Curated annotation (Swiss-Prot):
Lineage: Bacteria, Pseudomonadati, Pseudomonadota, Gammaproteobacteria, Enterobacterales
Any one of the GO BP annotations: response to antibiotic
Subcellular locations according to the entry: Cell membrane
Highest taxon of the lineage: Bacteria
Gene responsible for this protein: yqaE
GO cellular component: a single term: plasma membrane
Keyword list, A-Z: Cell membrane, Membrane, Transmembrane, Transmembrane helix
Record field: transmembrane: 1-21, 23-43
Disulfide bond positions: none
Record organism: Escherichia coli (strain K12)
Protein family (similarity comment): Belongs to the UPF0057 (PMP3) family.
Descriptive protein name: UPF0057 membrane protein YqaE
Principal subcellular localisation of the protein: membrane
Cross-referenced Pfam families: Pmp3
Membrane topology term: Multi-pass membrane protein
């Protein structure tokens, strides 16, 4: 995970997931989690990106 992807993920978690994994279920789930609260979306975004 590069420096700019980390910065983008911190600022806008769904965008970080979109850039890392593309448009799919992980992106949709991250949007929902971010709408429920910033912290759950942020945790999910980092989890999705470091899963590989």
């Amino acid at each position: 995970m590069g420096f700019w992807r980390i910065v983008i993920t911190i600022i806008l978690p769904p965008l970080g997931v979109l850039l890392g994994k593309g448009f799919g279920w992980a992106f949709i789930i991250n949007i929902l989690l971010t709408l429920l609260g910033y912290i759950p979306g942020l945790i999910h975004a980092f989890w999705v990106q470091t899963r590989d």
